[in-house]
Amino acid sequence: MQNLKFLIAAVSCLGPALAAPTPTSNFINSNFNKRASVEDSAFGYASLNGGTTGGAGGTTTTVSSYAEFTAAVQGDDPKIVIVSGPIEETAEQVDVGSNTSILGADSSAVLTGFGLRLKEVENVIIRNLGIAKVLADNGDAIGAEYSNNIWIDHVDVSSDRDHDKDYYDGLLDFKRGSDYITVSNSFIHDHWKASLVGHSNSNEDEDSGKLHVTYANNYWYNLNSRAPSIRFGTGHIYNNYYETVSDGINTRIGAQVLVEGNVFVDSKKALYSTDEGYAVERNNDFGDAKNEALEGTLTSVEYEYDLLDTSEVKSAVVGTAGQTLTF
């Protein structure tokens, strides 16, 4: 297995790299194929700004109904909420408090008909959880605004494409100055508008200098657009596997994105700019698509990460991304 490990100097995310990447051969990703622990550490941008620990050290509650779930995730005291089995309710997003870990016990932990809202909170972990078919009137599957330090890992988020593009809203949307977010090892599929970073061209005052988001080791499948779409922010997108995606990575309105080690199959637009968004791309396999983005300046990030060669991405991601953990 040929792998690259990057130890990056702590430099400005919008500036040029001050240190060249150092190749090594000791790739280890502890998130793959194992029983998970509440002590697992966030990586990517969620590891910065003091890190993201969720409800570590707090009380643990197991829930199996909508009423139990909504009660358990409230408040800002440290808490771990384990979802046991499916919960179905057509309702608006449930507000999640700070210092919270929401963990699906196994692959049956699926929320259907309602999503999660992270508003003016910090330090939230969501892992091994399924969220499906949240109607547009009820918000996103997972949405964050005015919030920071969020780790979304091994989730399965979807709707369908049988309805028009406005029947559902976003799957993973981050806006209004949210910051230090990682989306990893997740299955993002069967949807029109997958993941939006920065909701409006006119929101520069709130978003500029924020919206740092890592997307790592995710499986994007059967999507129309926003995989992801980033305005104003800073994105690091690596080792993702894209299959049957019409519009992939869209960098917009001054965004700076580092795109590396991703694979695109049966996809139309892999990487492109709108309104002067920028990208640096390295070692990607775009298949029949291509890079149509303006050249950017984001050549390094402020954390350590492991990078797979594109020949290894499919086997590492497909079948592993999504709800493949147990708690």
UniProtKB/Swiss-Prot annotation:
Source organism's superkingdom? Eukaryota
**Summary of pH dependence:** Optimum pH is 8.5.
Q: Which GO terms describe its biological process?
A: cell wall organization; pectin catabolic process
Q: Which GO terms describe its molecular function?
A: metal ion binding; pectate lyase activity
- Keyword Cell wall biogenesis/degradation listed? The answer is yes
Give the EC number(s) under which this enzyme is classified: 4.2.2.2
Any one Gene Ontology cellular component term annotated for this protein: extracellular region
- Enumerate the catalysed reactions: Eliminative cleavage of (1->4)-alpha-D-galacturonan to give oligosaccharides with 4-deoxy-alpha-D-galact-4-enuronosyl groups at their non-reducing ends
Signal peptide as annotated in the record: 1-19
Q: Which UniProt keywords apply?
A: Calcium, Carbohydrate metabolism, Cell wall biogenesis/degradation, Glycoprotein, Lyase, Metal-binding, Polysaccharide degradation, Secreted, Signal
InterPro entries per the UniProt record, alphabetical: Pec_lyase (IPR002022), Pectin_lyas_fold (IPR012334), Pectin_lyase_fold/virulence (IPR011050), PEL (IPR045032)
- Record field: temperature dependence: Optimum temperature is 22 degrees Celsius.
Residues annotated as catalytic: 226
Which positions in this protein are listed as binding Ca(2+)? Answer: 140, 169, 173
Cofactor details (free text): Binds 1 Ca(2+) ion per subunit.
List the carbohydrate attachment sites.
99
Cofactor dependency: Ca(2+)
The UniProt entry, under SMART domains, shows:
Amb_all
Q: Which Gene3D superfamilies match?
A: Single-stranded right-handed beta-helix, Pectin lyase-like (2.160.20.10)
Subcellular location field: Secreted
Function, please?
Answer: Pectinolytic enzyme consist of four classes of enzymes: pectin lyase, polygalacturonase, pectin methylesterase and rhamnogalacturonase. Among pectinolytic enzymes, pectin lyase is the most important in depolymerization of pectin, since it cleaves internal glycosidic bonds of highly methylated pectins. Favors pectate, the anion, over pectin, the methyl ester.
Q: Which PANTHER family match?
A: PECTATE LYASE 18-RELATED (PTHR31683), PECTATE LYASE 21-RELATED (PTHR31683:SF18)
Q: Which family does the record claim for this protein?
A: Belongs to the polysaccharide lyase 1 family.
What's the name of the protein? Pectate lyase A
> Could you tell me which species this protein originates from?
Emericella nidulans (strain FGSC A4 / ATCC 38163 / CBS 112.46 / NRRL 194 / M139) (Aspergillus nidulans)
Lineage per the UniProt record: Eukaryota, Fungi, Dikarya, Ascomycota, Pezizomycotina
